[in-house]
Amino acid sequence: LSDHFHAPHSKEYVRSFVDSINRPIVVSDFCKIVQGQVALEKEACLQARQQTCKLVFHDTNILSNLIYGSHYLEASAKDIETAGLGPGIGFIGQAPYDLYLFCQNDIPWKPEGRQRDSAQARDHLHEQFAQSLTNISALNATNATNAKTVLIHGSPETRLNLAINAVQACLETEA
């Protein structure tokens, strides 16, 4: 998407973090992961401003960190506060995201080493994301913001086309 729209993007910090430590992550890593993700997002947003680009893409955001942290690390509300986020969902709900592209789990699951450990965990986490995005939509409705969630499914080509169309629709709404 970033290439298609010629826009900056942020990657998923936890992937490079896991590669750099060469061990499974532990709860004491949670703050570093969240802070690293936030830093990558801020950097991509700064690049967008410098390029006067209307778009910036984030491979993920701290919502993922919170859900995965809760699932794999049993990260608590205290861990989230320590990471400097205050109430987790409040931060997410107030973040300046206009569109969530929610990838469905309709493609075959593949193991990813130290991450994403099973198809069953993927299904459970997918449900957690769906519930969290529903909560965010409710928050957005009460805050009169425009963040929208679009379901992305199908083959890789279909997924890309759905995502491109969703971003274009978002841009048209903003115009």
Which residues does each PLM region occupy?
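Conserved substrate/cofactor phosphate-moiety recognition/catalytic segment
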Residues: 2-42
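Anionic group-transfer/hydrolysis microenvironments
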Residues: 13, 60-61, 67, 104-106
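A short acidic, often aromatic-flanked loop/helix-cap motif at beta-alpha or helix-coil junctions
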Residues: 17-18, 155-161
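Surface-exposed cleft-lining segments at the edges of enzyme active sites
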Residues: 18-29, 66-75, 112-116
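Glycine-rich phosphate-binding loop used to anchor ATP phosphates in small-molecule kinases
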Residues: 31-95
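A glycine- and Lys/Arg-enriched "phosphate-lid" helix/loop adjacent to the NTP-binding pocket
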Residues: 73-136, 140-158, 171
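Short, hydrophobic alpha-helical segments
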Residues: 167-175
